[in-house]
Amino acid sequence: MNEPSRLRALRRAMSSEDIEALLITRLPDVRYLCGFTGSNAALAVTPRKSVLFTDGRYTAQAHEETRAARVRITEPLQTVVGEACALLERSIPKKIRCYYDPAHTTVSALAAMRASLSTGRRRGFFAPLKEPIVSELRMVKDADELDRIAAAALLGNRLFHAILQHLQPGVPEAEIAASLEFFARSMGAEGMSFETIVASGPRSAFPHGRATAHKTPRNGFVTLDFGVILKGYCSDMTRTVCLGKASRSERSAYDAVLEAQQAAVAAVRPGVTSGEVDEAARSVLQKAGLDKYFTHSTGHGVGLEVHEPPRLGREQKQELKPGMVVTIEPGIYMPGRFGIRIEDMVVVTEKGARVLTPVTKALIEL
């Protein structure tokens, strides 16, 4: 991974906004910038220095993983955020402010920040960022990130083919999810990127239907939405298959969702806004009279986290850029009847989009 170049890019972004000190407490951002994967950390960044703060449990791990930042182990009874703030207060000139991301700073971290200011002489020392500059950097993936995401997606593709062999009527959804997760670990995944969704029959109309003891029907749709973590990066894909033969109305609905998904993939290219991609999917479903059943956005970014910016939703203005990785996942959900969702991960290229999950999207009837 290329942490030094990421910190250089961050410093350029800080300079353009006249930011001379930044405190980062969001763990995926810390990992992105310096490589540390522990569960308790803060990263302080100034124009010339970057210091990772963590506690004594992670001494060896921090020194092994961290690149482009000095490691500082906090004293017992001192919070990581509090010690980072105290150092910044001592080392930064009085008129300089330290910025933080208000969207990803917890209440406890904010309390530690305030408590670290021992006197009122630095009132206003901490200030919220106007724009989430680390999140903006993370939206465009570098070559190493793209390789890792592609590898995770490839593993997801293999999992889909493996789990098809276990899909049959009368099997608890939770058993299917457990089998899928077992296969994932057996194939080298570090874990699942989110709780596996297996929703069958009328439950497929739940967009985020958790796998339950409900048994798969003799006839009806089964929605499989899953992802893995590999080398720290996530995958995410959805396919909807049919047990038994689909009815005419089920097939017609499936074809409409597939057409919407393909239209959105075709709309992805540099310069297009995320809202325009959403509209490409939504307009197809509108023509089919199904848009009222499409109750979520068309997609989202994927990387160190399975849900990242940009969001591909109505009226979203984020312009797509080469190197962004997003999902395209329109769906329809008819309560009491069925639901259908089809999801691919795509990377934005110089000329369009490359699909990372090229598993068949033709309706599979088992």
Region spans (language model):
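Active-site neighborhoods and metal-handling regions in enzymes and metal-associated proteins
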Residues: 1-366
